[in-house]
Structures are given as structure tokens and as C-alpha cells.
């Protein structure tokens, strides 16, 4: 981890990729996505001993080889769209490259990779993130809460604004390693403050963000209070909500034909990815089980039609 006295050459990286490729293929059933490392300190594509990241050609070659190392039906995530855009747009490598924003601060910052709202990079993640897993993390709380801006309370990353960004960019997952509970430190970091930040149904509807009818209700029907941390936790990835189940029985000679029709709404931030066969399962009064495989494509379970600025489910 971090920097070392001597770093790998590109040839070292390629040899390592060759070693990893069969292992990744063998274990792809437990892999959602691979994050592109290899270059520099912490694999963050900076500060390499051989200055590899100074060449766009080097970065493109390495990313293409990482994509070839990765199982065909899994994606690779890069830290900023600029790296993906080194690839030809009509290439297989481009189509399988997604995003991992490791500096989510929402508001503009010199180190945010030009990925705050209103930038081409932000818009690219919004457009392309609908079709591939997107991941990210906040900076370390021990860094962002160091009063660098002269704020007596440190630099708290806004929970409600973050929730909106995660929704717009179709986030599948978010690390809780950074800016939550770090290294046993007693300080409160941003995600702890999110737990104290109320979020209302009115706010979510105003921002066209997903919310279920009963999300702000307890089991007894009384009002439930929600906070920004809970909302992010509950809506990362997919959140399938049953709308209607129709069951029609038709008699045909001595047999009965059962027609089933199920309607769902996805109230999450993203659709499902990778392989998820869908079955109807029937259990009779004797606990005998019958499974019926459907032709449902779970990758199409979008929260709303991609590109729809009304975000209608």
C-alpha cells in the first residue's frame, strides 16, 4: 500500500494481469466489478515510481489490458471519466468500463476530478451509469474534517446533496470506510452527521428522487422520521417494490393452466447487474415446491427510463 522504494514496470503489470486472469474467471460468480488499479500509489493512477501515468498512451494500454483480464461479462471501474475517454468509443473496452468516484464531496473542489454537477464528467456518469455498476467513496474524514477551509466544524459533506448525486449517477454501492467510523477515532465524521440530518418526503418528491408510499410510515400507520444516512442505505442499488400480482386459472381438459403476471417498481438508485434468473415458486398445502423459470431480464429493471428528466418510475 502507498509508495515503495521501487515500483512495477508496465511489463511487471502485464505479467501480473496474466496471472490474475484465470483466477478472476474462475471466481466471477462473486465479482460485481473490478476496479482499475496497478498504477501508482494505492493503485490510484498517480505517483508511480516510473511516472507511467504521465503518458496517455500508457494509461490506455494498461486499461485495455485490464479490460481483457476481466471476465467478459463483468465491468471495470475507473476513478474518473477522463481515463475511460482514452479508449475508442466503439471498442469493447469502452463499453465495459464504468466508474468509481473515490472523492465524493458534492460541491466543487480542486481534487474532485471535475466530477461535480454541471461538468461534462458528471453528465457522462449520469448517462452511462444507468447501464453498469457505479461505486464510490468519500475522502477520509480525518482529512476532510481538518478545518482546511477555516470552518470551526471542519468540512462536513452534505448528506442530502450526496443522496441526490448518488441517485442521479445511479450508484450501486458506496464505501463506508471513509468519513463514517474511522480507525476507532472519537471524532464524528460526515456520515455520522447524516444520521442527524432529517430528510422528508416533500424534499424527495421535489427533487424527483425515489420513495415508496409507506417509507415515511410505521407499521401502525403513524409518521416515521427518516434521515439522510437511512435513505442512502435503503436506496443504493435496487429496491424492488411489488405493485400487483394477477393470477388467472384456466381449465383445459383435466388440467388447470395458471397464468401469473407480476408488476414491480424499482425504487432504488440503479438496476440489477450480472446474472439473476427469476422464478415463480409455488408451495402447496403439503409443502411441496414447484419452480417456474421466467424470461424476466433483471438488467432491465431500471428505476426510470434512462434519459427521462422527470424520473418517472
Residue ranges and their predicted role:
Residues 33-40, 44, 48-203:
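Catalytic-core regions of glycoside hydrolase
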Residues 271-279:
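Short coil-to-beta strand junction motifs in C2/discoidin
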Residues 1-9, 35-42:
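Substrate-binding cleft and catalytic face of glycoside hydrolase catalytic domains
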Residues 291-313:
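A beta-strand/beta-hairpin structural motif
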Residues 6-33, 57-69:
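An active-site-proximal structural segment forming one wall of the substrate-binding cleft
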Residues 264-271:
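Short amphipathic, basic-aromatic surface patches that mediate peripheral association
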Residues 1, 12-13, 74:
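Aromatic-lined substrate-binding rim segments of carbohydrate-active enzymes
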Residues 227-241:
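Proline/serine/threonine-rich low-complexity linkers at boundaries of modular beta-sandwich domains
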Amino acid at each position: 500500500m502507498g509508495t515503495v522504494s521501487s515500483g512495477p514496470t508496465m511489463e511487471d503489470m502485464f505479467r501480473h494481469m496474466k496471472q490474475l486472469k484465470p483466477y478472476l474467471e474462475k471466481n466471477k460468480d462473486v465479482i460485481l466489478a473490478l476496479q482499475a488499479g496497478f498504477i501508482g500509489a494505492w493503485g490510484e493512477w498517480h505517483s508511480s515510481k516510473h511516472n507511467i501515468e504521465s503518458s496517455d498512451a500508457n494509461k490506455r494500454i494498461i486499461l485495455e489490458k485490464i479490460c481483457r483480464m476481466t471476465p467478459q461479462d463483468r465491468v471495470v471501474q475507473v476513478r474518473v471519466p477522463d481515463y475511460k475517454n482514452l479508449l475508442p468509443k466503439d471498442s469493447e473496452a469502452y463499453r465495459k468500463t464504468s466508474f468509481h468516484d473515490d472523492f465524493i464531496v458534492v460541491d466543487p473542489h480542486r481534487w474532485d476530478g471535475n466530477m461535480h454537477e454541471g461538468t461534462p464528467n458528471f453528465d457522462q456518469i449520469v448517462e452511462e451509469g444507468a447501464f453498469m455498476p457505479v461505486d464510490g467513496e468519500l475522502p477520509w474524514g480525518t482529512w476532510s474534517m481538518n478545518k482546511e477551509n477555516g470552518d470551526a466544524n471542519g468540512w462536513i459533506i452534505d448528506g442530502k446533496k450526496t443522496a441526490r448525486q448518488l441517485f442521479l449517477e445511479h450508484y450501486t454501492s458506496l464505501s463506508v470506510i471513509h468519513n463514517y467510523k474511522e480507525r476507532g477515532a472519537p471524532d464524528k465524521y460526515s456520515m455520522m452527521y447524516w444520521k442527524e440530518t432529517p430528510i422528508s418526503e416533500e424534499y424527495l418528491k421535489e427533487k424527483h428522487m425515489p420513495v415508496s408510499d409507506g417509507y415515511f410510515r410505521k407499521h401502525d400507520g403513524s409518521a416515521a422520521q427518516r434521515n439522510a444516512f437511512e435513505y442512502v442505505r435503503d436506496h443504493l442499488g435496487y429496491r424492488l417494490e411489488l405493485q400487483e400480482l394477477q393470477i388467472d386459472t384456466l381449465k383445459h381438459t383435466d388440467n388447470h393452466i395458471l397464468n401469473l403476471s407480476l408488476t414491480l417498481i424499482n425504487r432504488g438508485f440503479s438496476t440489477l447487474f450480472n446474472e439473476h434468473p427469476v422464478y415463480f415458486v409455488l408451495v402447496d398445502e403439503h409443502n411441496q415446491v414447484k419452480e417456474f423459470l421466467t424470461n424476466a431480464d433483471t438488467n432491465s429493471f431500471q428505476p426510470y427510463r434512462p434519459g427521462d428528466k422527470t424520473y418517472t418510475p
